[in-house]
């Protein structure tokens, strides 16, 4: 989503609170709890899961492996739930022609650098760059190239924009900032 006026363009960036992340975190949590319960029930010799008889699973080695997969899945699931709750990657890109400043803000992981805030002068922007990689896993990313600072990604690598959408976005931003477009 973007908000625009004559002199200011604010592009809101969606972080890790996406439906796909919620689905993966939930599926991973349920699956890992299932694996852990099967491993524990094979150790205890009791059915903790009613639709799967624990007598068919021997604790060594199947029960141990299932327990390990369950614990590993719980760690990965809790990592996903933490990134969702902290909303890592959420933020905005603010382009202000009147002030001549570009501000990029993102939320990171908790700690000293939780708030990621970058500020540049518009006159230091060298170009808007489109990077296109075709193939099975096609990828189109929009970058802003800053003199002496390198490139800063403006779109997520998993955003999956069509060639027309990425070109349109790059053209509008380059026109707004009055900088050229480069395609790689």
From Swiss-Prot:
Subcellular location(s) of the protein: Plastid, Chloroplast thylakoid membrane
Cellular component GO terms, alphabetical: chloroplast thylakoid membrane; photosystem I
Keyword Membrane: yes
Pfam families in UniProt: Ycf4 (PF02392)
Domain of life: Eukaryota
Family, similarity comment: Belongs to the Ycf4 family.
Biological process per Gene Ontology, one example term: photosynthesis
Described purpose of this protein according to its UniProt entry: Seems to be required for the assembly of the photosystem I complex.
Database matches in InterPro entries: PSI_Ycf4_assembly (IPR003359)
Originating species: Coffea arabica
Transmembrane segments: 22-42, 57-77
Keyword Transcription among record annotations: no
Keywords: Chloroplast, Membrane, Photosynthesis, Plastid, Thylakoid, Transmembrane, Transmembrane helix
Bilayer topology term: Multi-pass membrane protein
Protein's UniProt name: Photosystem I assembly protein Ycf4
Higher taxonomy: Eukaryota, Viridiplantae, Streptophyta, Embryophyta, Tracheophyta
HAMAP family attached to this UniProt entry: Ycf4
Principal location class: plastid
């Amino acid at each position: 989503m973007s908000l625009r006026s004559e002199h200011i363009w604010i592009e809101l960036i969606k972080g890790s609170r996406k439906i796909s992340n919620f689905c993966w975190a939930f599926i991973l949590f349920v699956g890992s709890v299932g694996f852990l319960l099967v491993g524990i029930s094979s150790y205890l010799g009791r059915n903790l899961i009613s639709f799967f008889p624990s007598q068919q699973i021997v604790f060594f080695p199947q029960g141990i492996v299932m327990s390990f997969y369950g614990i590993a899945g719980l760690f990965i699931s809790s990592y996903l739930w933490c990134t969702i709750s902290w909303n890592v990657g959420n933020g905005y890109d603010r382009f202000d022609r009147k002030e001549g400043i570009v501000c990029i803000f993102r939320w990171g992981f908790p700690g000293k650098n939780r708030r990621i805030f970058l500020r540049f002068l518009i006159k230091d922007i060298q170009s808007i760059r489109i990077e296109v990689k075709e193939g099975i896993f096609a990828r189109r990313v929009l970058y802003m190239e800053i003199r002496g600072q390198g490139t800063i990604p403006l779109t997520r690598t998993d955003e999956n924009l069509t060639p027309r959408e990425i070109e349109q976005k790059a053209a509008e931003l380059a026109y707004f900032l009055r900088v050229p477009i480069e395609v790689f």
